[in-house]
């Protein structure tokens, strides 16, 4: 499930690569899922954080083969930068909690 900031060209390329891989390997589609996909407790769980998504990208054999390791590493590093920048920010919760403890 892509975010609103996804690159539509990369997203489409990834979907096409996955579809072609499925056709080539004659993979069966899993049964349709209903309910909250983020609460799915199967092995095919949707990443809940950018770090989880980055890890899934880096460990995807299919995407590394389709895009090449260099491309995957580039986008993984971009995600890591985003994570590092986010971790530098003091959130409203942290500020509020700090005042509560003071």
Q: At which residue positions do the language-model features occur?
A:
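Catalytic-core signal marking the mid-to-C-terminal active-site face
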Residues: 1-102
